[in-house]
Amino acid sequence: MLNIYLKSKIHMAKITRKEVYYEGSIEVDEELMEKAGISEGEVVLVVNVNNAARFVTYVIKGKRGSREINLYGAAARLGEEGDRVIIMAFTFSDKPVKAKTIVLNEKNEIIQEK
């Protein structure tokens, strides 16, 4: 039987920009995506730590090294610049999966990898 497991998590990312009238979703620095094991276009669950909003969207690859986490389109209504979010990707598996997690500081720099 297949179960759904957490496979990747970017913990405590800080929203750097938002734009409501934009085609898109959540843009994540390419380097952070790679470190967390998240692919462009992958569906993610985003949890806003500041306001408890939860939403499902897809990832847009951002500029490598920019440390930007940007909300676009309708998702931009669910967060403000400076809010901290948790970005999670899941997978189907018949066996437990060890999630890859990166923890970020207030500058969206990696301070811990698990």
Curated annotation (Swiss-Prot):
Q: Binding positions for substrate?
A: 57, 73-75
- Cofactor stoichiometry and binding remark: Binds 1 pyruvoyl group covalently per subunit.
Which compartments is it annotated to reside in? Answer: Cytoplasm
Give the EC class as a word: lyase
- SUPFAM superfamilies xref list: ADC-like (SSF50692)
Question: Which co-factors does it depend on?
Answer: pyruvate
- Coiled coil spans: none
Gene3D superfamilies attached to this UniProt entry: 2.40.40.20
Residues the record lists as Pyruvic acid (Ser) modifications: 25
Please name the InterPro entries in this protein's record. Asp_de-COase-like_dom_sf, Asp_decarbox
Pathway assignment: Cofactor biosynthesis; (R)-pantothenate biosynthesis; beta-alanine from L-aspartate: step 1/1
GO process terms (BP): alanine biosynthetic process; pantothenate biosynthetic process
Q: Modified after translation how?
A: Is synthesized initially as an inactive proenzyme, which is activated by self-cleavage at a specific serine bond to produce a beta-subunit with a hydroxyl group at its C-terminus and an alpha-subunit with a pyruvoyl group at its N-terminus.
Tell me the active site. Answer: 25 (schiff-base intermediate with substrate), 58 (proton donor)
Which UniProt keyword terms apply here?
Autocatalytic cleavage, Cytoplasm, Decarboxylase, Lyase, Pantothenate biosynthesis, Pyruvate, Schiff base, Zymogen
UniProt key word Ubl conjugation: no
Catalytic reaction(s) noted:
L-aspartate + H(+) = beta-alanine + CO2
Molecular function (GO) terms for this protein are:
aspartate 1-decarboxylase activity
Where is it mostly found? cytoplasm
State any GO CC term: cytosol
What does the subunit comment say? Heterooctamer of four alpha and four beta subunits.
**Biological function:** Catalyzes the pyruvoyl-dependent decarboxylation of aspartate to produce beta-alanine.
Which HAMAP family does its entry note?
Answer: PanD
The record's comment on protein family reads: Belongs to the PanD family.
User: What is the name attached to this protein's record?
Assistant: Aspartate 1-decarboxylase
Q: Which organism is it from?
A: Thermotoga petrophila (strain ATCC BAA-488 / DSM 13995 / JCM 10881 / RKU-1)
